């Protein structure tokens, strides 16, 4: 489980991006923050937390205390309905991360993600009910091939650029999100990880693929896009629905606008009724390339 990295980014950003802008910055009541995902062939994973006050000092203790426990979460694929069970794992930083997933004691009701399937989630927590829907679309847009080239205008000869050739099927409305994994690292999403097909509808095209970033660490803005000779690179390309696209498009815009006094306030577009966050389905394809030293 590597979702603790995404969880930290999500709960911090949702806590700040939803703050109302006014002159009297009072403390706000915590809201439920939901990060729920399901991928083809994988079990659902749901992380529940409480949002922070705008002026909170983020610490390991604050993060550890933000998880929401003992929620009743049910997930339906239209045929089966399963109730998820709460688990935890301990990160290398000794932080316990709590999440909900398949109940291993009731596998008869359990299911994993599948293409072309709609999912309905119901959350009951602290006397309130929250609902959301998502879908795993067909694996419509695919990566045909990967290769690498020397990083242009870079004096470091060990730096390379990943290049992908992809095909977009005819018809608007194909949305994607991508991640990269380098060697033993986890998958990280791109700085701008979501795209639509408004310009490239129905075409086969090539493009440079930026390296994914860990938003919980300082990012070298001049070099983060590059990979290195000797790297084993895995590209994860996922087809997503419109609501998942809208969430990450607005979330990433908000992330990149933090600290910019000239940017317009942006409301992150979630799809959880009554709460912050999102429930997203992913139709995933994986391709790996080894860059020689």
Language model: regions and residue ranges:
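Sec-dependent signal peptide hydrophobic core
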Residues: 5-9
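A sequence/structural signal for flexible, mid-protein segments enriched
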Residues: 18-293
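Positively charged n-region of N-terminal signal peptides that target proteins for export
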Residues: 1-4, 18-19
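C-terminal motif of bacterial Sec signal peptides marking the signal peptidase cleavage site
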Residues: 13-16
């Amino acid at each position: 489980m590597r979702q603790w990295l995404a969880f930290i980014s999500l709960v911090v950003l949702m806590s700040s991006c939803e703050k109302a802008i006014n002159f009297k910055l009072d403390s706000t009541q915590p809201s439920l923050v939901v990060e729920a995902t399901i991928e083809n062939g994988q079990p659902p994973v749901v992380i529940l937390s409480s949002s922070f006050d705008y002026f909170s000092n983020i610490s390991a203790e604050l993060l550890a205390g933000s998880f929401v426990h003992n929620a009743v979460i049910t997930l339906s694929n239209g045929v089966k309905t399963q109730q998820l069970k709460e688990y935890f794992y301990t990160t290398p930083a000794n932080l316990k991360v709590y999440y909900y997933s398949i109940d291993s004691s009731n596998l008869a009701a359990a299911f994993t993600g599948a293409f072309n399937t709609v999912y309905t989630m119901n959350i009951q927590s602290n006397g309130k009910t929250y609902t959301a829907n998502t879908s795993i679309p067909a694996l419509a847009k695919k990566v045909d091939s990967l290769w690498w080239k020397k990083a242009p205008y870079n004096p470091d000869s060990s730096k390379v650029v990943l290049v992908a050739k992809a095909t977009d099927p005819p018809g608007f409305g194909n949305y994607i999100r991508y991640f990269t994994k380098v060697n033993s690292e986890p998958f990280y999403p791109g700085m701008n990880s979501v795209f639509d097909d408004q310009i490239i509808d129905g075409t086969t095209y090539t493009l440079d693929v930026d390296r994914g970033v860990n938003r919980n660490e300082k990012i070298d803005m001049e070099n983060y896009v590059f990979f290195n000779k000797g790297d084993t690179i895995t590209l994860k390309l996922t087809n997503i629905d419109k609501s998942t696209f809208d969430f990450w498009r607005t979330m990433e815009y908000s992330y990149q606008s933090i600290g910019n006094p000239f940017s317009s306030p942006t409301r992150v577009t979630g799809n959880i009724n009554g709460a912050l966050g999102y429930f997203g389905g992913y139709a995933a394809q994986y391709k790996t390339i080894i860059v020689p030293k």
